[in-house]
């Protein structure tokens, strides 16, 4: 009941089973989702719209064990990033840029940047 109340008031959905370290910080938290088996280290920062979720099993099979990612100490994950899977680890002091989509691990001290295609404007 408390989880649903907190979600309705903040727009942040953190499963009560998530393992969260000290000094966890969410800035502009609307749309943040943290799954049940997520492990978050100390001094981690998340920004709006970040999802730490599970990959969907094939064929509707139920998956047991760790299904959500691990975020190690000192990592920062920027707006709109989606990180999925129980084997996915965001290494210590890494930075995941906005709108990244990850299903594989990131080594410690890595910067993940998504480069958008060029945007052009033409007169009508």
Descriptions of predicted regions:
Residues 60-68:
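Regulatory activation segment
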Residues 10, 15-16, 21-22, 27-36, ...:
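Left-handed beta-helix
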Residues 1-10, 124:
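Terminal amphipathic alpha-helical/low-complexity segments used for targeting or macromolecular assembly
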């Amino acid at each position: 009941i408390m989880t649903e109340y907190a979600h309705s008031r903040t727009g942040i959905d953190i499963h009560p089973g998530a393992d969260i370290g000290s000094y966890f910080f969410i800035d502009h938290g609307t749309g943040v989702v943290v799954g049940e088996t997520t492990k978050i280290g100390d001094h981690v920062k998340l920004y709006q719209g970040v999802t730490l979720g599970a990959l969907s099993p094939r064929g509707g099979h139920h998956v047991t064990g760790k299904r959500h990612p691990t975020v190690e100490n000192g990592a920062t994950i920027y707006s709109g990033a989606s990180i999925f899977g129980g084997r996915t680890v965001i290494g210590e002091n890494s930075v995941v840029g906005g709108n990244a989509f990850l299903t594989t691990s990131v080594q410690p001290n890595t910067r993940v940047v998504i480069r958008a295609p060029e945007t052009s404007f033409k007169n009508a």
